[in-house]
């Protein structure tokens, strides 16, 4: 096994003494920093490389923290309108996971970069910490690399805002197999339209 494989096996046992101590120290370190900052190198190089990171110019790592827990509905003075069924304010759960939210916040802040992927690094009682892999689409080292220059195309701008990253896809219900029949046609909305629309076929 290579060195990265050993690191990968280490992270599979997060309750081990080694990793509990390491994550505890790292959480303390991340709490002292701003909520979004650039990391000099990935904290988990094995995971970053599996998700597309390369230690070359044009690839950047941003570390971000997201507050854990559900989402409170932003209602002015508690005025909720409509039926009592939709009066909830506190116990609402967001559709997207916190990793997707973290990617979105990095993507909005770093508008000129492309978000490639992200991964979990640590968490404590209040926050979850993620590292987001970003790519500079205008860097020659990226544009000349045939394995990654697909991300330079304009169609891949803000992938994270459209649910095209791995974390974003998880809440869209997109996949293959018998459990993903509700999104046949591209999305839940496309599947619903196809099933609920009246089709008047012209037979010739």
Curated annotation (Swiss-Prot):
Under the cellular component aspect of Gene Ontology, which terms does the record hold? cytosolic large ribosomal subunit
Gene3D superfamilies from the UniProt entry: Ribosomal protein l15e
The family line of this record is: Belongs to the eukaryotic ribosomal protein eL15 family.
Which GO BP terms apply? cytoplasmic translation
* Keywords tagged on the record: Ribonucleoprotein, Ribosomal protein
The protein in question is named Large ribosomal subunit protein eL15
- GO-annotated molecular function: RNA binding; structural constituent of ribosome
Give the species this sequence originates from: Chironomus tentans
């Amino acid at each position: 096994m290579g060195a990265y494989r050993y690191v990968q096996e280490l992270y599979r046992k997060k309750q081990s003494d080694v990793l509990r101590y390491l994550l505890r120290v790292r959480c303390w370190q991340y709490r002292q920093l701003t909520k979004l900052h650039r990391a000099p190198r990935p904290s988990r190089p094995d995971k970053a490389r599996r998700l597309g990171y390369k230690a070359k110019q044009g690839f950047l790592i941003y570390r971000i923290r997201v507050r854990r827990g559900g989402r409170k509905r932003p209602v002015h003075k508690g005025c909720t309108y409509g039926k009592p069924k939709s009066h909830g304010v506190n116990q609402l759960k967001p559709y997207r996971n916190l990793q997707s939210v973290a990617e979105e916040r990095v993507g909005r802040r770093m508008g000129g970069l492309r978000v490639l992927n992200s991964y979990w690094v640590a968490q404590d009682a209040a926050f979850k910490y993620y590292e987001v892999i970003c790519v500079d689409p205008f860097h020659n080292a990226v544009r000349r690399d045939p394995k990654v220059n697909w991300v330079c195309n304009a169609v891949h701008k803000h992938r994270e805002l459209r649910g095209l990253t791995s974390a974003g896809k998880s809440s869209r219900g997109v996949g293959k197999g018998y459990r993903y029949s509700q999104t046949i046609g591209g999305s839940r909305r496309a599947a619903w339209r196809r099933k609920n629309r009246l089709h008047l076929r012209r037979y010739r």
